[in-house]
Amino acid sequence: KLTINAACKMCRLCVKKGPEGAVEYVEDTVRPSVDKEEWKGIAVYVDHVDGKIHPVTLELLGKARELAQVTGHPVYALFMGNDIGEKCHELLHYGADKVFVYDEPELARFKIESYTAVFEDFIQNVKPSSILVGATTVGRQLAPRVAARMKTGLTADCTILEMNEDTDLSQIRPAFGGNIMAHIKTPDHRPQMATVRYKIMNAPERSEEESGEIVNCSIAKERLGSHVDVLDIVLKEKEKFIENADVLVVAGRGVKKQEDLEMLQKLADLLGGQLACTRPMAESGWLPAKCQIGLSGRTVRPKLIITCGVSGAVQFTAGMNHSENIFAINKDEKAPIFKTAHYCLVGDLYEVIPQLIQKIEEKKGA
């Protein structure tokens, strides 16, 4: 008996090893094609809350400007919301050639149906070659739906973006647990879409003068309908996020007991920082998932990060390798983290951390 289900990897082994004629692999004889000349420009989705623009948008505008230099394409920003007429001018200080604004009362709050409809309208009218979306809570919902609507590809959590002269975008991200870097392209479809996490790219400096133009867009009201009604909004108490910390102390597998985290927390408090962790620590429940650094956690870029008993797997270092100063403590002198760190200390964290705490306390008491 031969069974093929959704887990099929298209390896064709069943064709070669199975009974003759039982399984046939049929390939598309006509490869899809796209007229790339019709699609021009690199667009950035403007992620915001009540007009306050998320900094990942500015980072993506800087990257879009860099990519556009290869092809000579313009840089677009897609801004949708309500009462955002004044706020959209800020984007002209960060390299956007055109800001396409959809200012409608129905767009005051994020609703997936209406936001997708606006995104689709923008793509159909402007035809951007590439679209960059921040990997935020909203971006992670919106980008896949738009890609499916346009029948195009989407690469999530890219760490590197490179543009070819033929306007094909190389979307690069770690794969297979960080063991390889996958180079993904969408050569036969447009637009090309990618999401990028906050603090992966560098934000450009704000220019003194505006350069570019605002394009006010309209869309039929019936397209903004939604099956979701926002009845009330309850503001959460403001939290501290490791992405915003200037100093981080990171707990790795070298920490033997959950109680020992108090020692690292004390070090973090003395330095005015926060405690973070690697994936195994979060999965064991020792620290909440919001404290996890890496591809499956948060991306950080603090002024100082101290790793304690962290081996330094690629999936972890991809989330922190842009930190200004990386100080690594590990008793294994061959630990991969030492290839990433700026300062390396081979030693037992249970000996090093107490001494470090003592020195800092003495310095503060002096």
What are the language-model segments listed below?
Residues 1-366:
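N-terminal glycine-rich FAD/FM-binding segment characteristic of electron-transfer flavoproteins
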